[in-house]
Amino acid sequence: MLPAQKHTLETLLENSVKQVVQASKGDADAAFVLPAIALERPKVAAHGDVACNVALQLAKPLGANPRQLAEQIVAALTAQPEAAGLVDAAEIAGPGFINLRLTPASKQAVIGAVLAQGRAFGASERDHDKRVLLEFVSANPTGPLHVGHGRQAALGDALANVLASQGYAVHREFYYNDAGVQIGNLAISTQARARGLKPGDAGWPEAAYNGEYIADIARDYLNGETVAASDGEPVTGKRDVEDLEAIRKFAVTYLRREQDMDLKAFGVKFDQYYLESSLYTEGRVEKTVDALIAAGMTYEQEGALWLRTTDEGDDKDRVMRKTDGTYTYFVPDVAYHVTKWERGFTKVINIQGSDHHGTIARVRAGLQGLHIGIPKGYPDYVLHKMVTVMRDGQEVKISKRAGSYVTVRDLIEWSGGATPGSEGSPELLDEATITRGRDAVRFFLISRKADTEFVFDIDLALKQNDENPVYYVQYAHARICSVINEWKSRYGATDALLPGADLSPLDSKQAMALMQKLAEYPDVLAHAAGELAPHAVAFYLRELASEFHSFYNAERVLVDEQAPRTARVALLAATRQVLENGLAMLGVSAPSKM
């Protein structure tokens, strides 16, 4: 049911309930509160198209039999002239459930709506006056983007698209942790490689990163190469193995450039890159700490500065400033979120790995302790669990200590079917391979709830059958394109015939089910935005593709008779549009041929 139809039906039912309550109570209780009208899709198709339990809700306060109340509500509903265009039949089930069957014309109306609105179908201006800052990926510039970052990138970009579809002004932000111990470890790792050392050698730093990518950084530094991140100034290797600060700057910029390349291949763009180091250079960390001290939110103990996080529900107070004068990692996070608030973002969503769960209470406690008007529960979080990668039936082993990762680039190349010899060499990959891999990786990583662990099966991503969910959805789109092209070629038809087509021939069970599924799309987007759940769009697309295949297998589209032929093509055109719209939300292509 389309949103406008749903609103109309809710209003009609509300009017009906008012009549029944008025008849039962008269004006004796003006304060009586009517229950909200909740419409649901019955779990069993045979029970109708829409179910409502309002009679059960009214039974106790009115002291009446719920089934009799349901009969009275239905009578009042069907007596309203406006209901005739929506409600075909009404039935009472069980103790008092109201099951409604919608008219064929009301179901067919979705086709005209989709064809008229095109890419805008499903979008809403419900939240047009709201701004939201969405922070995701936010990887340390100490190594390549791995599969966990890939899940964040896919979830974050899709959620940004979904929120934008509901009218939000979305600001995509990447927070670079370019300060602290890990950056120091990156610098000494690169310096050791530049000196000719490798993991296991005498003199290799214990805290160093062991990955081979460190050797690549050291090589380019010694060769005097110039590197630049997308938002920064170029940095040239000084070739001086003793200048640790020069090595640090080069290594950070080198890895930021590599991450930029990975994000570009993945189709993810950011509005802003925010550097942790700027919080220190601008004095924001010190200012935040001073404000918390002034607010009485801290205390000194054993030479360290503690934050009273238990005041805000944490299980124990947390150290802010260690005995050596350095800050613990959550302190700059508090300062960073103050900047988000000061920039006018009253709604902030962070997408992070589930290992960040422990920092939530600390960051929120710090923000509350500042007493600057930030609401409790700020910011919102979407936490995702781990991704395990399977290839050739075996788990791909990773070792953080050894510096071995499954990178985003690996996933794209493997899932795209990169030929042996081209893996690890982007310049050797054709655009089709990159697109195929990107589509598979994005769809797969979005296709499960964020808080569930996910097994990414490369072998499944390469399959070209209905076992592969992204292939299944994309194939539905491509099949429709093929049928419509054949329709135009064989009958000399054009798209102009479709908006005004007679849709009455679309009366089969399969056609009705497909049209109802199309009409659900706006609600799916609204739900995905409200629950911060982009996986709902992936679920929906698989269901829509399934309904299309059921219809296509049950009914010939290009029949001899013009009226049913044009009606069925119109249904296919609407289905194609919604598939395209949904895939676009996920950042996945909608191919016309496969």
From Swiss-Prot:
MF terms (GO), sorted A to Z: arginine-tRNA ligase activity; ATP binding
Keyword Translocase: no
Record field: catalytic activity: tRNA(Arg) + L-arginine + ATP = L-arginyl-tRNA(Arg) + AMP + diphosphate
GO biological process: arginyl-tRNA aminoacylation
EC number: 6.1.1.19
Domain of life: Bacteria
Keywords: Aminoacyl-tRNA synthetase, ATP-binding, Cytoplasm, Ligase, Nucleotide-binding, Protein biosynthesis
Motif mapping: 'HIGH' region: 139-149
Disulfide bonds: none
GO cellular component term of the entry, any: cytoplasm
Compartment list: Cytoplasm
SUPFAM superfamilies linked to this entry: Anticodon-binding domain of a subclass of class I aminoacyl-tRNA synthetases, Arginyl-tRNA synthetase (ArgRS), N-terminal 'additional' domain, Nucleotidylyl transferase
Quaternary structure and interacting proteins, as annotated: Monomer.
HAMAP family for the chain: Arg_tRNA_synth
Stated family: Belongs to the class-I aminoacyl-tRNA synthetase family.
Official protein name in the record: Arginine--tRNA ligase
Organism: Burkholderia mallei (strain ATCC 23344)
Gene: argS
